[in-house]
């Protein structure tokens, strides 16, 4: 099922999803364009078709436009900035609210008087999934973290997904981790990328540090010690 496929990073499951999208669940002949059209439709609903709104330069996202079987696991020519993945996982964490992003909380004058405040703005809401379907995704992302030794004995329940972004056969993959916590009632979502970082567990270790600081598990002095932690291992480490 989808929860187990997420938890085990099972490419075969999602290859099959991509193929089903291109064959209307096996009812028609394979149609690459039809499969890609469906992937683009859902990716757009989750905010992956445009920049997030932050007030700094941001690359335009690229939703895959070929090879739906590969695109279904994030390959093909999918291409996203880390913050775009951050908004994507935030939408998953809150069951479909896609927010306009901003770096600003408020603007003050030189005397500290508030001139303008910035409230959260919802770009759109994904209403094509029901609670059972959202919960299946949440369960799978929780299973991912339960398979990561990085989070052994971590006091906050985290849900997330590891990944490796491939750029060149001559350099290591980019290390990726997206997630949110607490699992049952999310307060924070996060996307981490280490350029050419080899394994997603390096990114997961960094994300754990952010969660640790946010939830007062460790303070800055403990975390910023100049030493890299052992990244640990996972039963799905070869499948990211």
Residue ranges and their predicted role:
Residues 1-194, 237-240:
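Beta-lactam-recognizing serine transpeptidase/beta-lactamase-like catalytic domain environment
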Residues 24-25, 92, 197-198, 208-213:
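Short, low-complexity, polar/charged sequence segments that are solvent-exposed and flexible
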Residues 30, 97-98, 183, 202-205, ...:
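Glycine-rich loops and low-complexity Gly/Arg-rich segments
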Residues 85, 199-208:
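Short, charged, low-complexity patches
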Residues 114-122, 208-240:
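Short, gly/Ser/Thr-rich active-site loops of penicillin-recognizing serine hydrolases
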């Amino acid at each position: 099922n989808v929860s187990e496929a997420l938890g085990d990073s099972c490419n075969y499951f999602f290859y099959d999803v991509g193929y089903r999208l291109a064959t209307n669940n096996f009812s028609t002949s394979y149609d690459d364009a039809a499969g890609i059209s469906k992937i683009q439709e859902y990716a757009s609903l989750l905010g992956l078709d445009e920049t997030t709104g932050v007030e700094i330069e941001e690359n335009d996202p690229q939703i895959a436009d070929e090879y739906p079987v590969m695109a279904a696991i994030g390959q093909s020519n999918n291409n996203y900035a880390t913050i775009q993945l951050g908004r994507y996982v935030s939408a998953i964490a809150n069951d479909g609210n896609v927010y306009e992003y901003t770096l600003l909380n408020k603007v003050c004058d030189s005397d500290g008087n508030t001139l303008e405040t910035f409230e959260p703005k919802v770009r759109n809401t994904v209403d094509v999934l029901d609670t059972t379907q959202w919960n299946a995704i949440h369960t799978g992302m929780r299973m991912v973290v339960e398979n990561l030794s990085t989070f052994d004995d971590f006091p906050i329940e985290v849900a997330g997904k590891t990944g490796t972004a491939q750029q060149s056969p001559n350099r290591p993959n980019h290390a990726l981790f997206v997630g949110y916590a607490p699992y049952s009632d999310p307060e924070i979502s996060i996307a981490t990328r280490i350029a050419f970082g080899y394994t997603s567990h390096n990114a997961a270790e960094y994300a754990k540090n952010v969660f640790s600081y946010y939830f007062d598990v460790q303070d800055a002095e403990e975390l910023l010690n100049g030493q890299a932690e052992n990244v640990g291992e996972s039963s799905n480490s070869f499948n990211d």
